[in-house]
Amino acid sequence: MNLKNPETPDRNLAMELVRVTEAAALASGRWVGRGMKNEGDGAAVDAMRQLINSVTMKGVVVIGEGEKDEAPMLYNGEEVGTGFGPEVDIAVDPVDGTTLMAEGRPNAISILAAAERGTMYDPSSVFYMKKIAVGPEAAGKIDIEAPVAHNINAVAKSKGINPSDVTVVVLDRPRHIELIADIRRAGAKVRLISDGDVAGAVAAAQDSNSVDIMMGTGGTPEGIITACAMKCMGGEIQGILAPMNDFERQKAHDAGLVLDQVLHTNDLVSSDNCYFVATGVTNGDMLRGVSYRANGATTRSLVMRAKSGTIRHIESVHQLSKLQEYSVVDYTTAT
């Protein structure tokens, strides 16, 4: 390889990456509704780690399962892939919505995002971010520092609807009580979700969904993954880091981060050559979940590439005998 001109991600990478999220969804799918989120998440991590190392790339996990001493696999800074091919930053969430998965509730998904090496934002252990995300019609029209009503009116105008027809998806958390009140005072509707704000943001950017905006404070890693999706869909995300304690504030200071800076889509992912891949674990607004039958299973995935603007919906039929290769989980029974 010419180190001065390393390979850049190409269209083939997207189809390799979807195999990774399919494996994670299949591994965690057997744990849906069983009330065991750690076991289900662990199965997804195992499967994702196994499959991601078969992908032709020189990947580095930028957004993973935690620091090296906290996560045995898919930790921040871990090198993944075959060691050949394009050099990429990787962001993973083997199960976005572990509680949703454990309780058998909608919108649990397995996610992987990728971009050219060195182009993903590193939040330096600041785990939360105030966020707003919208679809293509309202991109460039929102301002995270403006009042809630301003953004609702801007989205309504850009979509040609009344503010009363705008639906805002918000994580159901005590910290959002005032935000929810502001949304309703502006005349808009609120859709509360218990987990999974990546799925909420993607739903807001899809024409076929009845969600128009995602607002609120959620995970910074999810914000970066969402930025990859917005790049692919033509939407927009804005964020402001929201450290929860002095330790996070110090980590941000040590890393040279500006806490009151508005982070735009391009700040979170600076490359236009990026990918977003997701496979449904449970049925949801964005994707249907894994469905099992006697001799195998079916998965539904969303595969997007920003450079080409291509969005693919993929339904895959998997043979039961092959599923056993993905994880230690027994796919024949829910043990």
UniProtKB/Swiss-Prot annotation:
Disruption phenotype: Strains lacking this gene are unable to grow on the carbon sources acetate, citrate, glutamate, and lactate and display no detectable fructose-1,6-bisphosphatase activity. Substrate binds at residues 96-98, 128, 173-175, 195-197, 219. InterPro entries: FBPase_class-2/SBPase (IPR004464). Pathway: Carbohydrate biosynthesis; gluconeogenesis. Its cofactor is Mn(2+); Mg(2+). Its main location: cytoplasm. Coiled coil: none annotated. Manganese. Mn(2+) can be replaced by Mg(2+). Induction: The FBPase protein levels during growth on glucose, gluconate, ribose, pyruvate, lacatate, or citrate do not vary much (inferior or equal to two-fold) with respect to the carbon source. GO terms for cellular component: cytosol. It is found in: Cytoplasm. Inhibited by the monovalent cation Li(+) with an inhibition constant of 140 uM. Also inhibited by AMP and phosphoenolpyruvate and to a lesser extent by phosphate, fructose 6-phosphate, fructose 2,6-bisphosphate, and UDP. ATP and ADP have no significant effects on FBPase activity. GO terms for biological process: fructose 1,6-bisphosphate metabolic process; gluconeogenesis; glycerol metabolic process. This is Fructose-1,6-bisphosphatase class 2. It comes from Corynebacterium glutamicum (strain ATCC 13032 / DSM 20300 / JCM 1318 / BCRC 11384 / CCUG 27702 / LMG 3730 / NBRC 12168 / NCIMB 10025 / NRRL B-2784 / 534). The gene is glpX.
